[in-house]
Amino acid sequence: MEWVRGETIGFGTFSTVSTATKSRNSGDFPALIAVKSTDAYGAASLSNEKSVLDSLGDCPEIIRCYGEDSTVENGEEMHNLLLEYASRGSLASYMKKLGGEGLPESTVRRHTGSVLRGLRHIHAKGFAHCDIKLANILLFNDGSVKIADFGLAMRVDGDLTALRKSVEIRGTPLYMAPECVNDNEYGSAADVWALGCAVVEMFSGKTAWSVKEGSHFMSLLIRIGVGDELPKIPEMLSEEGKDFLSKCFVKDPAKRWTAEMLLNHSFVTIDLEDDHRENFVVKVKDEDKVLMSPKCPFEFDDWDSFTLDSNPSFDSPVERLGSLVSGSIPDWSVGGSWLTVR
């Protein structure tokens, strides 16, 4: 498979995303694609993403992978993942251009349904995405969206959960479910919680959790994992939307609705005759160029995805969280933005 690298359109901690065009007679894939490239430091994450995408197969709501390749650039071996190109970038990039405004509820309903169909496919194949957020939902010219960035995705057990033996924080704090913080439990239910956070953000233009500038991200994890506090549901959202989110924001993952169940909820099944993709597309000016996810982490105002490992195990969430906020961990307050650490 031969291709020619184009301009750089985004950066991750260990990876760079570029456009690319195919050479003549180089296989059956689009003329314009996206290439995620990394050196040896990010090879494991890229390899995991390729393996997961291969296992998932084709799904209209999941970004397509056309293969992988290795190149030598400036004397260094690069690992490349050839992906479907999303011309409008991520929903996070798009909403940033709206200046804090949310999307129309009809658009939120449609995007939510698309992500749910993607999650249903992911979960049915025995995987959890582990990092659902607006930055990992890509937008196309026709207004459709697809789930992307499977670098943190993992295969789960038969009950659709996976338990890590080490003390690990995995994903993006603002989207983490209580069981991820308390029990190292990652699975389909955690993806549903994260989707609820994404729905709040799409509708309101604000994150589901309010955090003060300069606060330690571990203080947010304590709010998520300890006590009864839940993400705030927007007051202006319809009753169907509020009820939908109440099914996502259930502390007990066993009682949280599944993607399959939520696809039958009236919030996404309601028939809106005037809801056409064209109505959404015209809101984006042709000259507006948005970055494809993953974009430069220094452009995020919120904490980005990462993994943080420790060794001991603890008997209670309070003990575990206490260890995580100890003095051994630097105070990475929100003075800037967060890097993806995988």
UniProtKB/Swiss-Prot annotation:
- Catalytic class of the enzyme: transferase
Phosphotyrosine (modified residue): where? Y41, Y66
Name the GO cellular-component terms. Answer: cytoplasm; nucleus
Q: Knockout: what is the outcome?
A: Short roots with abnormal twisting (e.g. leftward skewing) in media containing microtubule-disrupting drugs (e.g. oryzalin). Stronger sensitivity to high salt concentration and higher water loss rates under dehydration conditions. Increased accumulation of superoxide under high salt condition. All these phenotypes are associated with reduced MPK6 activity. Insensitivity to abscisic acid (ABA) in terms of root growth inhibition (e.g. root cell division and elongation) and stomatal response leading to increased water loss under dehydrated conditions.
* Annotated positions binding ATP: I9, G10, F11, G12, T13, F14, S15, T16, V17, K36
In the Enzyme Commission scheme, what number(s) does this protein have? Answer: 2.7.11.25
Q: Does the keyword ATP-binding apply?
A: yes
Q: Which InterPro entries match?
A: Kinase-like_dom_sf, Plant_MAPKKK, Prot_kinase_dom, Protein_kinase_ATP_BS, Ser/Thr_kinase_AS
Tissue specificity comment:
Expressed in roots, seedlings, leaves, flower buds, flowers and siliques.
One Pfam family hit: Pkinase
Q: Return one Gene Ontology term, BP aspect.
A: protein phosphorylation
Q: Which family does it belong to?
A: Belongs to the protein kinase superfamily. Ser/Thr protein kinase family.
Name of the protein: Mitogen-activated protein kinase kinase kinase 20
List the top taxonomic levels of the source: Eukaryota, Viridiplantae, Streptophyta, Embryophyta, Tracheophyta
